């Protein structure tokens, strides 16, 4: 059994995961497994910051452009299929590099999913009525009181997960956070080394603002307009969760004349910053991550390349960068 560590690079949006994973995969002859729940959809390119075509051509990426918008693909599907892909790459002697920031994709792959109670139609219907009557903020405040750690990881506007969290609490009599602590563990035969890219908040926010501007300049408005025209009915009926992605939903609201373009762009940057905060909260509270100061310098990148090119045992080092540097000294 191949127990060579599998490198996982995670971090908040705009932290540099794509570029670092590409460099390591290219220099190790590896392939990238994208842990991004939006890049998996075809047609959502600029707004999800997909790697440019030259990167995709130079290094094989998996789980990008795999599905049409609207095709079902759950975090459980990703965890199962990503584990299968890692085993396949190991059998072929290829180094897999997992990179992404989708919290549930990463949790499912790294820890497995806790056993949660099935949906209760009556409780869900009651919560839905409360949502319609009192709004999402009231339900979010309730979740904050009952399970503050879970609330910190949720976008208050994503009502599906909000209702599910409250439903689980109502059914089980305990919190989602407590239930999620009882996970089955990583896939059999796969050993992960997880590093998180830790940027100073000011730098991270600056990068988010710059990327938002770059997306607009690259044609995000036209991309969103095409999707809005194609999925207008689904957007209005809230039947496609993918369409609620930051960067698209603000422009869709602009197309509905709820605000002007400048406001939409400002909201994209603001909502992306909020999303980055929720990602960091989730990673720090729910996953075992070795955080490294980013951006990494050349010596640190080369140390990672060397470490994952040569290491064959099944130990998970506390600091792969530090150990690799020591070995190469």
Swiss-Prot record:
Pfam families: IPPT. GO terms for molecular function: ATP binding; tRNA dimethylallyltransferase activity. Residues 36-39, 160-164 are annotated as: Interaction with substrate tRNA. ATP binds at residues 11-18. SUPFAM superfamilies: P-loop containing nucleoside triphosphate hydrolases. Its cofactor is Mg(2+). It comes from the Bacteria. Belongs to the IPP transferase family. This is tRNA dimethylallyltransferase. It comes from Chlorobaculum tepidum (strain ATCC 49652 / DSM 12025 / NBRC 103806 / TLS).
